[in-house]
């Protein structure tokens, strides 16, 4: 059975407090004192203290910016080409750093047989997968694939592919790396979608090593389940435009999740022959404070059951597909610190569609 035997996570060097990010957004979005107070309120209610970015500008005086122009209206506003250049200049180095940490002490880089790159915030050909191969001097006959533009649930999709590779190749050493540079796509037009995106999203990278190794402690991947609710297809979307990627994220998304999530979990567990009582740890994508709250309410979870998701949201924001890797790593550290012999983990994430992906794993 395939097993996640190592996890590593990390962020770009520029950390920004939520207060600094509010100040940047306030200068862009607020037209008067009333709007400024409203914006400050939603930022302070976000449940986020700090986020990271490949862009230093969010905490700098306008004269010191390197990405956005030194102008009150941010014109000439960065186009898609400039944003993709920044992705190509920074994503590979961050990915290589985290992959190296992930495999350290487990395997050599030359032992990697499969590479799965996951991102919805940057694309090119040759892409991130080939950049990583070149920088790390990986085997030229390595099998690789890319999970592109699927959104926040894509890490679970990547794990499904890793599980399939391990099932087909007993000696497989699969690396799944989720690299998201969400802040590259900051938009200045005043809209609910842009304001919500500006207060939630962050940059981060998570890598996982998946192997058929029974002797190593880790998360044995047992079951996956996916379901799409098309009634929410207009409420969460991610589209390309000339000025960057555009996010649609309506206030109805938490209600959609609240309506369907408990039923989804029940169906996923039933298909795996499990019940809620079997689950010791819940690994939920920290898509936002309201989303975590409705999950707690709909599933009637005891306080503290989603503590790791809340912690990731507070310290890093929403890093799209990388977020759930951060949560899973925190669960792993807790189990290791407590010398726990075994645990049952249920994970779930959400994205455009509205798509809900889940996984079931045993720590052993």
Label the predicted regions.
Residues 67-70, 82, 86, 97, ...:
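A contiguous, well-structured pocket-lining segment that forms one wall/lid of small-molecule binding clefts
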Residues 96, 120-121, 139-141, 146-167, ...:
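Claisen-condensing/thiolase-fold acyl-transfer catalytic domains that form or cleave C-C bonds
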Residues 42, 46-137, 276-292:
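Conserved beta-ketoacyl condensing-enzyme motif
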Residues 2, 109-113, 140-143, 169-174, ...:
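Short coil/turn connectors at secondary-structure junctions
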Residues 123-138, 176-187, 234-238, 292-306:
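Acidic-glycine-rich active-site phosphate/pyrophosphate-binding loop
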């Amino acid at each position: 059975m395939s097993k996640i035997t190592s996890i590593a996570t990390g962020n770009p060097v520029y950390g920004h407090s939520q207060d600094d990010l509010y100040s940047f957004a306030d200068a862009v979005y607020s037209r008067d004192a009333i709007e400024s107070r409203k914006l400050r309120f939603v930022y302070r209610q976000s449940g986020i203290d700090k986020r990271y970015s490949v862009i230093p500008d969010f905490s700098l005086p306008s004269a010191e910016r390197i990405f956005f122009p030194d102008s009150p209206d941010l014109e000439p506003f960065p186009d898609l080409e400039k944003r993709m250049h920044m992705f190509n200049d920074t994503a590979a180095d961050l990915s290589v750093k985290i992959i190296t940490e992930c495999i350290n002490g487990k395997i050599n880089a030359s032992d990697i047989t499969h590479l799965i790159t996951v991102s919805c915030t940057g694309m090119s050909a040759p892409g991130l997968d080939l950049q990583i191969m070149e920088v790390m001097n990986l085997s030229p006959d390595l099998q690789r694939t890319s999970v592109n533009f699927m959104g926040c649930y894509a890490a679970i999709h990547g794990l499904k592919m890793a599980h399939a590779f391990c099932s087909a190749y007993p000696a497989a050493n699969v690396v799944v790396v989720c690299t998201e540079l969400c802040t590259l796509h900051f938009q200045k037009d005043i809209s609910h979608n842009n304001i919500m995106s500006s207060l939630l999203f962050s940059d981060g990278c998570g890598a996982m090593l998946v192997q058929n190794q029974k002797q190593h402690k880790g998360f044995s991947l047992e079951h996956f389940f996916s379901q799409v609710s098309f009634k929410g297809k207009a409420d969460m979307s991610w589209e390309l435009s000339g000025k960057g990627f555009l996010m649609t994220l309506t206030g109805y998304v938490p209600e959609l999740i609240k309506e369907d999530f408990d039923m989804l979990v029940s169906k996923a567990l039933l298909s795996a022959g499990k019940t809620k009582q079997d689950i010791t740890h819940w690994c939920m994508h920290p898509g936002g404070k309201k989303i975590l709250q409705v999950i707690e309410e709909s599933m009637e979870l005891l306080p503290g059951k989603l503590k790791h998701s809340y912690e990731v949201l507070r310290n890093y924001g929403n890093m799209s597909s990388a977020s759930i890797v951060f949560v899973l790593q925190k669960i792993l550290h807790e189990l290791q610190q407590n010398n726990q012999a075994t645990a049952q983990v249920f994970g779930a994430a959400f994205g455009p569609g509205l798509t809900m992906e889940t996984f079931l794993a045993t720590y052993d």
